């Protein structure tokens, strides 16, 4: 899709990119096909799309003979959605806030995949929503801010809170980087496609999720500090308790939070008494 074609489409529907919703329309449709390929879409699949906008990804999906449920918050795209619904019996939509929509009830009993170009400002919340959903998707293939994508797919040495919160439940991999000039209007930062595959069976045994995330938040609030300092200062633990616990787990007290593996965090959570 050329910039001229996109502008004509926007003009025909009287649409304007909404800065409040962080709308940037992708012009390079080969990226859309790459996302569909990465998700291993096959005929009959149920696809959940968030933020269909002008419907270019939606139409590509429907060409693959899948069922698509699109969630759109911005009412200006209603004419586009109505046109798609009129032309495709396998397409349905909800005009609502994705962060408040009950996907688990709507898709109860139906396996589904999420494929979407999501606004930067809700990226983290959307990903977390599906990690903790009662009815989780098989996978998520998302176009998002490059920095966030690489944070999610981080490895020990550069781990962070969102990486751990996703990788406890799924495997994540950055597929490709999409430069800002591929969008209209062009965002100030580059984007990336990330593919997240949910674990079919739990990979990790989490005994107390609330406790685990209390520890993680406390430690990553000072991630440049050494682990023993964050545990002592942010969780009000005595130096003796911290020293003995880390020694028992054979964790270097001088290590920084981003260097720990998920297994080490889980062991630490099991040992600490808060």
What label would you give each PLM region?
Residues 1-218, 247, 258, 274:
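Catalytic cores of RNA-modifying enzymes
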Residues 198, 218-274:
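C-terminal lobe and adjacent flexible extensions of AdoMet/dcAdoMet transferase-like proteins
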């Amino acid at each position: 899709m050329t910039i001229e074609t996109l502008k004509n489409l926007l003009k025909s529907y009287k649409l304007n990119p909404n800065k409040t919703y962080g709308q940037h329309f992708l012009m390079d449709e080969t990226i859309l096909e790459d996302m569909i390929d990465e998700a291993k879409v096959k005929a009959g699949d149920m696809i959940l799309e968030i933020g269909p906008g002008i419907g270019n990804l939606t139409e590509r999906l429907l060409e693959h003979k899948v069922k698509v449920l699109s969630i759109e918050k911005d009412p200006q795209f209603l004419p586009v959605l109505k046109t798609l619904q009129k032309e495709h019996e396998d397409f349905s939509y909800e005009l609502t806030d994705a962060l408040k929509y009950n996907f688990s009830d709507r898709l109860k009993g139906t396996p589904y995949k999420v494929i979407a170009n999501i606004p930067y400002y809700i990226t983290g919340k959307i990903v977390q929503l599906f990690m903790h959903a009662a009815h989780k998707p098989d996978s998520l293939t998302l176009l998002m801010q490059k920095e966030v994508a690489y944070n999610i797919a981080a490895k020990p040495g550069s781990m962070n809170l969102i990486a751990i919160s996703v990788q406890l439940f799924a495997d994540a991999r950055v597929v490709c980087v999409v430069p800002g000039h591929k969008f209209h209007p062009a965002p100030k930062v580059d984007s990336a496609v990330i593919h997240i595959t949910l674990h079919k069976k739990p990979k990790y045994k989490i005994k107390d999720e609330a406790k685990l995330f209390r520890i993680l938040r406390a430690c990553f609030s000072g991630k440049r500090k050494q682990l023993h300092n964050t545990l002592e200062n942010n969780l009000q633990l005595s130096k003796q308790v911290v020293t003995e616990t880390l020694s028992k787990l054979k964790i270097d007290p001088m290590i920084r939070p981003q260097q720990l593996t998920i297994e080490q965090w889980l062991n630490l959570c099991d040992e600490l008494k808060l």
